[in-house]
């Protein structure tokens, strides 16, 4: 036991404590401790509930942002499909246009080729005619010169002179 000279203290030996002391002290501890413990538990519960509400709000916000992002992704995928489709159509149109242009150019070149061949043939024929005429003239001149004598030459000159005088 604790003597009075030593002051106030707690007896930690359970066998030496008196049941009445415990009956007085324990209700005081439970009464005062209950309010403090209840207050601490209420504060802790409010913090936990606040954290849960905050987490729930953040989850809802994240869910909204996810839904928005999914919608934007779907829109972007649709645009990609549209762009690919337009690209294919444009490529097909350009290919068809290029093919028709190439066919047109080939037709034009074939026409130019035929025209060039025809012109070269005409040029060759004209050159051949010219050479033929020159050869014929040369043969005619040689033939005339070989057959012409002085009296025939004089008759020819007289005929030309009379032709000139009759025009005057």
Curated annotation (Swiss-Prot):
Annotated Gene Ontology cellular component terms: chloroplast thylakoid membrane; proton-transporting ATP synthase complex
Assigned keywords, A-Z: ATP synthesis, CF(0), Chloroplast, Hydrogen ion transport, Ion transport, Membrane, Plastid, Thylakoid, Transmembrane, Transmembrane helix, Transport
A GO molecular-function annotation: proton-transporting ATP synthase activity, rotational mechanism
Pfam families hit by this protein: ATP-synt_B
Domain of life, source organism: Eukaryota
Family, similarity comment: Belongs to the ATPase B chain family.
Described function: F(1)F(0) ATP synthase produces ATP from ADP in the presence of a proton or sodium gradient. F-type ATPases consist of two structural domains, F(1) containing the extramembraneous catalytic core and F(0) containing the membrane proton channel, linked together by a central stalk and a peripheral stalk. During catalysis, ATP synthesis in the catalytic domain of F(1) is coupled via a rotary mechanism of the central stalk subunits to proton translocation.
HAMAP family for this protein: ATP_synth_b_bprime
Assembly notes: F-type ATPases have 2 components, F(1) - the catalytic core - and F(0) - the membrane proton channel. F(1) has five subunits: alpha(3), beta(3), gamma(1), delta(1), epsilon(1). F(0) has four main subunits: a(1), b(1), b'(1) and c(10-14). The alpha and beta chains form an alternating ring which encloses part of the gamma chain. F(1) is attached to F(0) by a central stalk formed by the gamma and epsilon chains, while a peripheral stalk is formed by the delta, b and b' chains.
Further comment found in the protein's record: In plastids the F-type ATPase is also known as CF(1)CF(0).
Name this protein carries in UniProt: ATP synthase subunit b, chloroplastic
Organism encoding this protein: Ostreococcus tauri
